[in-house]
Amino acid sequence: YRLQNNYNNFKNGSTCGGPCVNRKEIIYAGANNGILHAFESSNGEELWGYIPPNVLGNLEKIPSSKANSTNAIYGVDGSPVVKDIFFDDTPNDGSTNPRWRTILLGALGAGGHGLYALDVTDPDNPTHLFAINHDGTQQVVQHWDVDGNKNEFGYRSGNIDPQYDYRKLGETWSTPRIIRIKVSGKDKWVAVFGGGYNGAVNPNYGSAVFIIDLEDQGRLLKVIDIEDQANVIHNYVFGTVSNNTQTEFNLANYGLTSYDISCCTLKVYGAGSIRYSITGDQNGNTMNNLKLRFDEAPPGGITLMVSKVNKTDIVNSIPADLSVITADGTNKANYNGAMVYATDLEGKVTKINLTDKGTLYETTTLFNSQSTSDNGRYIYTRPEVTINNDSNLWLY
């Protein structure tokens, strides 16, 4: 691939603000004040700082009314990654001109539900590529394109353009990995990362793996749901009318007449940040006459889902980095693309196929520790991967 696309010409050329082979070595580091810093490694000099557009709105929260103190916003809390990729970095100029560029991709970590990307081919002159932000409270996804134009995509109605469906994106603790995969037989540069942290309280986001298109300004290719795969007993799906004012729903009307509280619990999806409760009449371990009540009427025309799941007090999410196996990392990988391994707070290990062998995006649960708050089997870290001499892969 690199030979076919003249990678050596790029490495030996002068598109990096000078000869690329002699390009400055830069240390990129995010800070809780909301700034990504670029330091020259040879002398520690700071070359520049960058505030991503999805962080700007939080800066006003830093000043504190208390003397000699500030409020922490966590800002640019995630670790950035840098890689050379071959793509058209000027997609809005009416022509297609792919070339090798060095891109930096960063996640906000505890600073928010978002990512940002820069072109750092010339380390003295970085340029903005795109940024993404998910606001779960306002139920909106924000996207800044390569020209800095901001577009918003609300989903209170339950619908959103699939290219911007970041509804399940939590705090982006999971460091993105930049890889090249085959999509419809063509090479494509993508980033893959976990859905992040949800505070262990919000089931609406965090339990997914995202694959985004780096050649198309961060638009989505695929969201793979990892949520409660082993625990869901049944889903009850219904919707609100277009001019909805209803705050109470009789769940028997949608097929949920009762459940056993000794083994099961109910989870509600689709209402965003609207507070709710489920009430009923208890007879022993059985709850009957179930009512779903919201503090305010949900928006009209949305889809709601009540899931009956095996009893667990864990709200699942994927805060850990992913383990990604590519041919760049081992000669045992006889495929294009990557094999990805994700861990989650439910204690599961999931394999995701992003190779050209088998079915693209196929998932397999390899391990389930059945974690609870009592046994504490949460997994916050990525699995360590090794390949032994007879080509067997081991996860630790």
Predicted regions and their residues:
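Extracellular/luminal ectodomains and secreted, surface-exposed scaffolds of diverse proteins
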Residues: 263-297
